[in-house]
Amino acid sequence: MKKIVMALVAFLMVTTSQAQWRVGITGGADYNVFNMDQQYMTDYKVDGRWGVTLGITGQYNVTDWLGVRADLNWTQKNYRHSRVVYSDVDYKLTNDYLQLPVMASFSFGGERLRGFCNLGVYGAYWLNSHRKGSDWNTFSDRTFSFDEKVEFYDKRDQRWDCGLVGGIGLEYLITRHWAAQAEVRYYYSTISTTKQYMRNKDYRYHSTTAIQLGINYIF
């Protein structure tokens, strides 16, 4: 029993000595794909679009290979939809989300250059939406352009989101207290952006890949 207690104390001392906090900022670009069931809309075309992601991050390292990381970021989830038959119909949508991913961070490698893998879940809130493009007016028989804010409709739009998140990257220790990171991260939404208020079910999901750089201060 005495040996077990001593072993536990030794383990806790090692863990505590290796534990450290870090905070930082991140920024980069993301490519979003909007997945939907087109049903009867056979000429409806949906394409992904690039956006921007910016955020702050905090991480607590339990050991030199395991940490708990939480980010707060602003991420755009943009997409474009058009019609194959009616080439004048072209909508470019820009969607801003506030996201909170919480992840386990696994690290491996040498002292200065290390690889890492982040796995976890995220919650998000749809802040606003904007659309720009052109459409066809059947009454006037002409094309018109628009550039406007999209108003949310509570019965239709699901503004809360959550899903799975994972990422891989490299970290370079610049000095004892500063480190730079490069990461490719993937967000997989599990909640449809539309509420099922109509007879025909209409499920729509975001899948977002972010390429981001970051700088961390290590305490």
What is each of the regions a protein language model found here?
Residues 19-58, 157, 218-219:
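Short glycine/proline- and aromatic-enriched beta-strand/turn motifs that initiate or cap beta-hairpins
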Residues 1-26, 215-219:
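Bacterial Sec-dependent N-terminal signal peptides
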Residues 39-45, 85-92, 151-156, 197-203:
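Extracellular loop and loop/strand-boundary signature of outer-membrane beta-barrel proteins
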Residues 104-110, 153-157, 169:
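Short helix-to-loop capping/linker segments positioned immediately adjacent to catalytic or ligand/cofactor-binding
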Residues 21, 29-35, 59-141, 174-176, ...:
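Gram-negative (and chloroplast) outer-membrane scaffold detector with strong preference
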Residues 46-51, 92-97, 154-163, 205-207:
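Short sequence motifs at beta-strands and strand-loop junctions characteristic
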Residues 156, 161, 166, 172-219:
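Predominantly the C-terminal beta-signal and adjacent terminal strand-loop region
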Residues 134-152, 196-203:
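Solvent-exposed, glycine/polar-rich loop segments of beta-barrel outer-membrane systems
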